[in-house]
């Protein structure tokens, strides 16, 4: 599963403080290619035609709908650059509390209103979503927008846009997609929330650029507005005199803000605000209604299915030039850990040794460190990996470290989430013996410890090793030194009936579990997370897990791209692996100065699949698991590994039926 390649390179970045509308996202190379194959052109947005006296369309004088197509697409759609326009429609979503639901807004120019290789620049604004009772889903907090950027020509990277007003460049003859997500807080009141998205074609000249605030100015404006909010927000129960004083102070601050130069053009000589420009701006914009129904179901904070995903510590060390164990190293791991928790997955960091032995750990600090409990007790973790320190060294110090960690953790309520991952895909009896030996060490300190072992075949030097029967009999080689038997979905192929053969060999009464994983396989048309697969194919990985009855899931790597020693270097997938295999997010530095990772569309679809499991679990708890399976098939969402929906509608039907029967 793991290998390290080598690559050096870099991608052009905008200088700090430059408006993102003035540059185009650079190409990100995969196995090969790049350059103009990704629509890259090293140009800005200034129009040279204006200087030459050539007639240029003024987008402020005509409706934006005459300049560009706008339509919405579901989150399972792969909206490529050659995606053709669909009819305009409004957005209507259904979401539970503590759920993220996403949709795409596609933009394609009808003609060009700029020059220098661009079709034009578009501004996107979104209002808060409000309910009739006055509750809000706040734009910039619960609502976010990201630009879908192609990787190897396939839409995948989700690059955050500047908020509250985003600007993007459109290229002639190409479709661009914006990924809009709604994160519903766990405490959000149920109801129908309404808002709108305004999409407006802009002038691409120096005058427009001058109206954009610098980052420092934006921060000052943000600070002033936040101060006003803090003055008036906590007025409940306050004496009337204090409320009046707070309002007076806030009014004074707001009047001061309106005197900023950036607002001067909206004022007449008498100081009253001239709304004509605003009305004209709104009238030429494309107005897309954005509605979300929040229903009275809250996704559990702790995922029902433990889904453990690996993060290579060596990739982080190489790309960000971090010394193992340094302050920067701990900061980087901490940042990755916290960021990945939002996707309902339980991360573990890993370092690979010879013959596929692995050091896997969720917390980079020892169990007696003050920070460790913050990791292990996080309710968003469904499972955590405990490091087996002797895998790196058989020294007394390593054994003492293991003993100390286990003795501390086994006394905690969260110990039931703990597991040890020692070896990836053992291939022969010698490797099986090493697993048994390491497990014995661990069980000396904690007889109830759980050992996880992944495998796709029986030991090669055992009798009949090449047969499915040898694969099924693996538990007899590893019992009682493995409790979580994690098998490859590739072995099953399209034979769901083989699940019964696997589970029949297990002893759940003795704490044995069956988990699954995907890696290089299975391949198309079965569900996996390779780049270029259909969106429903990505989402169906978790449908398959739920239908087959696995109690957990493992994915070998989320950041295992080729080695580089430069943070902003272009991304290349590892040779020998299907594109996208082992890569679910990208370094933020590739796209901007930000250090925050960039999610892939595939990672968002993993989240959607994890959320679907919670919906199906709710339905099954009301009507039985058999009825849950019947719903999955009746709606046409998922029938088998090669028979699942290619369209999004059955997903909406399934979710709507669960909403209707369990919460409406």
Question: Predicted regions span which residues?
Answer:
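Catalytic domains of carbohydrate-active enzymes that cleave complex glycans
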Residues: 374, 387-394, 398-431, 435, ...
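Surface-exposed binding patches on compact interaction domains or structured appendages
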Residues: 17-88, 110-179
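Contiguous beta-strand segments within globular domains
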Residues: 88-111
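Short, surface-exposed loop/turn segments at beta-strand-coil junctions that are enriched for proline
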Residues: 183-190
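Active-site clefts of carbohydrate-active enzymes
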Residues: 509-535
């Amino acid at each position: 599963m793991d290998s390290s390649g080598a690559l050096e390179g870099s991608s052009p970045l905008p200088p700090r403080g430059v408006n993102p509308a003035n540059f185009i996202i650079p190409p990100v190379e995969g196995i090969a290619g790049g350059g103009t194959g990704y629509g890259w052109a090293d140009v800005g947005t200034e129009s040279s035609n204006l200087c030459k006296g050539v007639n240029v369309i003024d987008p402020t004088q005509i409706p934006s709908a005459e300049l560009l197509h706008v339509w919405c697409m579901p989150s399972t759609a792969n909206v490529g650059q050659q995606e053709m326009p669909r009819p305009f429609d409004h957005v209507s979503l259904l979401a539970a509390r503590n759920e993220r639901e996403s949709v795409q807004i596609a933009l394609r120019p009808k003609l060009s209103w700029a020059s220098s290789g661009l079709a034009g620049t578009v501004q996107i604004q979104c209002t808060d979503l409000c309910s009739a009772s006055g509750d809000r889903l706040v734009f910039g907090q619960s609502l976010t927008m990201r630009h879908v950027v192609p990787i190897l020509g396939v839409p995948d990277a989700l690059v955050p846009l500047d908020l509250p007003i985003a600007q993007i460049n459109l290229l002639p003859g190409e479709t661009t997609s914006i990924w809009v997500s709604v994160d519903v807080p766990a405490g959000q009141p149920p109801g129908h929330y309404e808002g709108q998205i305004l999409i407006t074609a802009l002038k691409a000249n120096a005058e427009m650029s001058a109206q954009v605030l610098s980052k420092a100015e934006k921060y000052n404006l943000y600070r002033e507005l936040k101060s006003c909010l803090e003055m008036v927000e906590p007025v409940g129960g306050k004496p009337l005199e204090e409320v009046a004083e707070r309002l007076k102070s806030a009014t004074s601050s707001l009047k001061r803000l309106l005197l900023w130069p950036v607002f001067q053009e909206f004022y007449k000589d008498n100081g009253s605000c001239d709304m004509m420009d605003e009305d004209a701006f709104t009238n030429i914009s494309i107005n897309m209604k954005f509605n979300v129904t929040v229903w009275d179901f809250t996704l559990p904070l702790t995922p029902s299915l433990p889904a453990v995903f690996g993060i290579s510590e060596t990739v982080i060390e190489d790309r960000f030039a971090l010394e193992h164990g340094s302050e920067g190293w701990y900061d980087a791991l901490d940042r990755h850990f916290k960021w990945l928790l939002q996707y309902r997955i339980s991360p573990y960091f890993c370092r690979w040794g010879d013959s596929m032995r692995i050091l896997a750990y969720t917390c980079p600090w020892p169990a007696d460190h003050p920070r460790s409990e913050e990791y292990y007790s996080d309710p968003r973790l469904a499972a955590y990996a405990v490091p087996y320190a002797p895998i790196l060294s058989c020294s007394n110090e390593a054994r003492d470290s293991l003993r100390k960690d286990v003795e501390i953790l086994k006394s905690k309520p969260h110990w039931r989430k703990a597991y040890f991952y020692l070896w990836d895909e053992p291939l022969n009896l010698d490797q099986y013996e090493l697993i048994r030996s390491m497990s014995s060490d661990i069980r000396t300190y904690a007889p109830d410890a759980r050992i996880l072992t992944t495998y796709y075949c029986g030991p090669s030097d055992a009798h009949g090793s090449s047969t499915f029967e040898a694969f099924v009999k693996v538990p007899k080689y590893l019992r009682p030194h493995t409790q979580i038997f994690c098998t490859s979905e590739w072995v099953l192929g399209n034979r769901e009936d083989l699940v019964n053969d696997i589970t029949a060999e297990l002893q759940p009464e003795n704490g044995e579990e069956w988990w699954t994983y995907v890696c290089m396989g299975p391949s198309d048309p079965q569900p996996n997370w390779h780049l270029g697969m259909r969106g429903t194919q990505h989402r169906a990985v978790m449908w398959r897990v739920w239908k087959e009855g696995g109690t957990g899931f493992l994915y070998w790597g989320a950041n295992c791209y080729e080695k580089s020693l430069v943070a902003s270097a272009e991304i290349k997938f590892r040779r020998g692996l299907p594109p996208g295999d082992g890569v679910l997010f990208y370094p933020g530095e590739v796209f901007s100065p930000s250090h925050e990772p960039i999610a892939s569309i595939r990672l968002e679809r993993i989240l959607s699949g994890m959320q679907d499991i919670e919906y199906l679990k709710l339905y099954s708890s009301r009507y039985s698991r058999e009825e849950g399976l019947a719903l999955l098939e009746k709606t046409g969402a998922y029938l088998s590994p090669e028979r699942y929906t290619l369209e999004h509608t059955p997903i909406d039907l399934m979710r709507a039926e669960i909403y209707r029967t369990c919460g409406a």
